[in-house]
Amino acid sequence: MISTTNTGSTIPTLATDRLVLRPLANGDVPGFVEIWSDPEFTRHIGGRGDPDAVWHAMAGNIGCWPLTGVGPWAVVERPTGMLVGRAGLWTEPGWPGIEAVWFIRRDRWGRGYAQEAGTAAIDWVFGERPHLTEVVSVILPANIASIRVAERLGMTRTRLQHLHGEEHAVYTVSRAAWLATRASAARPTTR
């Protein structure tokens, strides 16, 4: 079971070589409406691209931070300042653990942004939570692109689990395995 406590903390901003992971903001709604209006995008993660649905999804994402101490960030491309997706961490009661999550707008697929953002999020959470033993990713088995990202992040499929009415594959990386592969890499900078 996940305990829900108000951490009172602010949401950090992370920076990688090509991306900034910053707190979600009301001004992101139009960008996320555009992303969620792409049927090829929503085929794998669901949702719909109307402003009310996007706003409510963002409110839930933002609410994850004070309730659990983790949550997703807006992913912004550094050179252009363009909102290109959402990535970070997620958990809720009944969830298999703290989950690394990501999605990138379709015109930016294939650039490694999901892996870069996922790496930053996992580095951050293992750095902030010294007693956390693993991070998971919950992926629909047909979402081959996300499975490949999880595998590039060093995750392995550990089980199937029925969540939100569908069967999902749960991928896991342990703290020990993560730290062993990241020993020579620096954590993302926090601004």
Language-model features, listed with the residues they occupy:
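Short Pro/Gly-enriched beta-strand edge/turn motifs at strand-loop
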Residues: 56-58
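A short helix-loop-beta-strand connector motif used in the catalytic cores of GNAT acetyltransferases and
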Residues: 61-74
